[in-house]
Amino acid sequence: MREVTVRKGEPIDRALKRLKTKLDVEGILDEMRRRRAFETPMDERRRKARSASKRNKVKWRYSNKSEETASETAETPASAPEA
C-alpha cells in the first residue's frame, strides 16, 4: 500500500496530488479502473493491441532519430590526408 506523509503546514490538496501522481506513475489507478468491471477476452486483446501500437509508434520515432544521426555521421567523409 502506498502512503504519503503530510508535511507540517502542507495543504491536504498538495498531499493528495502527490499521492495521485505516485499511484499514476506506478499504474495502480489504471489497473484499478480496468478491474472495476469485467473485461471480455476480446476487449482485453483490443486494449493490448492498442497499447502495443502506441508503444511501437514511440519506439519507431526514437529509433529513427538515432538512425538518422548515425547515417549523417556515416555519410560525411572522413578527412583523409591528401597526397
Curated annotation (Swiss-Prot):
One of its GO terms (biological process) is translation. The keyword Protease does not apply. Residues 47-62 have a biased composition (Basic residues). InterPro entries: Ribosomal_bS21, Ribosomal_bS21_sf. Residues 71-83 have a biased composition (Low complexity). Pfam families: Ribosomal_S21 (PF01165). Keywords: Ribonucleoprotein, Ribosomal protein. Transmembrane segments: none annotated. Residues 40-83 are annotated as: Disordered. GO terms for cellular component: ribonucleoprotein complex; ribosome. GO terms for molecular function: structural constituent of ribosome. It comes from the Bacteria. Belongs to the bacterial ribosomal protein bS21 family. HAMAP family: Ribosomal_bS21. This is Small ribosomal subunit protein bS21. The lineage of its organism: Bacteria, Pseudomonadati, Verrucomicrobiota, Verrucomicrobiia, Verrucomicrobiales. The gene is rpsU.
